[in-house]
């Protein structure tokens, strides 16, 4: 099992919230789910991540830095590989795709 760095516990305690209160605020059924998120045992769904961002006023990169770094690295590696794929002719669609792939590094979240 891979553990991930998370700052949920720090933020929850900073604001004086219990795990049960955070669970209620972010729409999960139990404090056990919040505990698993805090310990880095489980990753949040997109909905839970958005709720945590709203609750604590922090970005995904601030709450889950390792997850964001891994996702960015994967996308950038695959984008670079796709740009290196041999292309006999550049259709308009392929040109648009290459434009998108070249822009990916500038979209990375710097932490």
Regions found by a protein language model. Name each.
Residues 1-14, 106, 111:
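A short, Lys/Arg-rich alpha-helix, primarily the initiator
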Residues 17, 28-29, 58:
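The short coil/loop that forms the "turn" connecting the two helices of the helix-turn-helix
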Residues 54, 64-111:
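Short, charged recognition helix plus adjacent turn
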Residues 47-62:
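DNA major-groove recognition helix of helix-turn-helix/homeodomain DNA-binding modules
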Residues 11, 25, 36-37, 66:
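Residues in the recognition helix of alpha-helical DNA-binding motifs
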Residues 6-25, 76-87:
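Short basic helix-loop element that most often maps to the first helix and adjoining turn
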Residues 27-44:
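Recognition helix of helix-turn-helix/homeodomain-like DNA-binding domains
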Residues 8, 19, 31, 46-49:
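Helix-turn-helix DNA-binding elements, focusing on the entry/boundary residues of the two helices
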């Amino acid at each position: 099992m891979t553990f991930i760095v998370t700052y949920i516990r720090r933020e929850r305690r900073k604001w004086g919230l219990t795990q049960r209160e955070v669970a209620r605020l972010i729409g999960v059924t139990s404090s056990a789910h919040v505990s698993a998120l805090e310990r880095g045992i489980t990753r949040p769904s997109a909905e839970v991540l958005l709720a945590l961002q709203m609750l604590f006023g922090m970005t995904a990169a601030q709450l889950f830095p390792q997850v964001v770094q891994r996702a960015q690295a994967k996308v950038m590696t695959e984008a670079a590989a796709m740009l290196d794929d041999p292309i006999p002719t550049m259709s308009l669609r392929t040109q648009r795709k290459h434009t998108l792939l070249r822009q990916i590094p500038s979209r990375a979240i710097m932490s």
